[in-house]
Amino acid sequence: MAKVDQITKKRAMTGNTRSHALNHSRRRWDLNLQKVKIYDENNNIVEVKVTARTLKGLKKNNKVVKVDYSKPAKVYGQNSPK
């Protein structure tokens, strides 16, 4: 499940980019995904990829164990080493 928030199931949004001359081309707005360790329903620690907005709610409800900002989250299926 690359580029998907694993809690809210949100995906990237698509649309058009418009210039001043009203030219258009297709583009996508990707999510701000962060890899984080959280507690699940059984109080086990699970590593998930969530958006920054979801992470804000998790921090508010004290569900976050650890956020690893030192390494970017792996994006599978895109420019992966062979």
Swiss-Prot record:
The keyword DNA-binding does not apply. One of its GO terms (biological process) is translation. Residues 1-25 are annotated as: Disordered. The keyword Phosphoprotein does not apply. One of its GO terms (molecular function) is structural constituent of ribosome. GO terms for cellular component: ribonucleoprotein complex; ribosome. Pfam families: Ribosomal_L28. Transmembrane segments: none annotated. Keywords: Ribonucleoprotein, Ribosomal protein. Belongs to the bacterial ribosomal protein bL28 family. HAMAP family: Ribosomal_bL28. This is Large ribosomal subunit protein bL28.
